[in-house]
Design a protein with these regions (language model features):
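A short, well-structured alpha-helix characteristic of acyl/acetyltransferase catalytic modules
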Residues: 46-102, 220-231
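A short helix-loop-beta-strand connector motif used in the catalytic cores of GNAT acetyltransferases and
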Residues: 105-115
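Conserved beta-strand in the GNAT
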Residues: 115, 123-132, 141
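A short, internal acetyl-CoA/4′-phosphopantetheine-binding micro-motif in the GNAT/acyltransferase core
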Residues: 117, 143-155, 180
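Conserved acetyl-CoA-binding loop-helix of GNAT-fold acetyltransferases
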Residues: 154-167, 188, 192
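Conserved GNAT acetyl-CoA-binding A-motif
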Residues: 170-179
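Conserved catalytic-core motifs of GNAT/GCN5-like acyltransferases
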Residues: 178, 196-212
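Conserved active-site alpha-helix within GNAT-family acetyltransferase domains
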Residues: 183-199
Length: 231
C-alpha cells in the first residue's frame, strides 16, 4: 500500500452486523456470526468479511469431531477399510487402499474435513466434511460421512450430525446432504434426523453421472424442533 499522511485516515470502524435473509440493507449472507470491518478513507469505504470457521473442534457426550490431519491416515483407514461400509455407496471400492487414499487426501486438502474420535478409547471411528459454502444463499453441504460398523445402530450418527449442524447454523441458513440414489442406508438415516428430500435427482461434475438425491435441513426448522430428533 502507498504511504499516506496520517490525516488521510479519518476513522476505522469495526461493525458486528447480525444479518437475516429479510434485511435487504445488510450483506446477503444469511449469517449471524460474520464480522465486517469497514475502513473509511476520506469517504471511501472498504469492507472485509471474515470467513466462518470450517474446521472447529466439536465435543459431544461420547464423540469428538476434530479437524482431520495427514497423521490420521493409518487409524482412519483401519476404520474405513470394511467393504460393508461402502457396499451401497456410489463409490463402493472406497474400502481399498487406493480408493480410501483418494477419499482421505480430499478430506485433508479440503480444509473442511473432520475425524471422529471415540472419547471412551481415543479410536478414530469415522469422518465427514463441510463443502461448498455459498454465502449469498447461506447454504453449505455436509457430506463424505462414514462411521465404523462398530458404531452403527446407536446414537453415534445423530451425535456427530448434531454437532456439525449446530456449528453450521452459526453461519448458514440451510444444510444440504447429497445422497446416492442407491444408498438406501443413508437415505433412511437422513429421514431419521429430519432431512427433507428435494424433488428430482441431481448430478454434479465432481461425481460424474452418478444420480443423487438432495436432502436439506433449514435453520428455521432445526431450531423449531428438528434438533430434538438428534437428541
Amino acid at each position: 500500500m502507498a504511504r499516506t499522511d496520517p490525516g488521510f485516515v479519518s476513522r476505522i470502524v469495526f461493525l458486528l452486523l447480525p444479518t437475516t435473509p429479510h434485511d435487504k440493507k445488510r450483506p446477503p449472507t444469511g449469517a449471524h456470526s460474520l464480522f465486517w470491518l469497514s475502513i473509511f478513507f476520506n469517504g471511501a469505504t472498504f469492507s472485509y468479511m471474515s470467513q466462518p470457521d470450517f474446521q472447529p473442534t466439536l465435543v459431544g457426550p461420547t464423540i469428538t469431531v476434530r479437524p482431520i490431519s495427514a497423521d490420521d491416515w493409518k487409524d482412519l483407514f483401519a476404520a474405513g477399510s470394511d467393504p460393508k461400509i461402502w457396499e451401497v455407496h456410489p463409490v463402493p471400492d472406497r474400502y481399498t487402499e487406493a480408493g480410501f487414499r483418494k477419499f482421505f487426501d480430499g478430506a485433508v486438502d479440503s480444509k473442511m474435513g473432520f475425524a471422529f474420535v471415540d472419547r471412551a478409547n481415543g479410536r478414530l471411528i469415522g469422518s465427514s466434511r463441510y463443502y461448498g459454502y455459498e454465502p449469498e444463499s447461506g447454504e453449505i453441504e455436509i457430506g463424505w460421512t462414514f462411521l465404523a460398523r462398530s458404531h452403527w445402530g446407536g446414537a453415534a450418527n445423530r451425535e456427530v450430525k448434531g454437532l456439525m449442524l449446530d456449528h453450521a447454523f452459526t453461519f448458514a441458513d440451510t444444510v444440504v446432504f447429497w445422497v446416492g440414489e442407491q444408498n438406501w442406508r443413508s437415505q433412511g438415516a437422513m429421514t431419521k434426523i429430519g432431512g427433507r428430500k428435494r424433488e428430482g435427482l441431481f448430478t454434479r461434475a465432481l461425481s460424474g453421472e452418478t444420480p443423487y438425491f438432495i436432502f436439506e435441513i433449514t435453520k428455521a426448522r432445526y431450531e423449531s424442533g428438528g434438533r430434538t430428533l438428534l437428541a
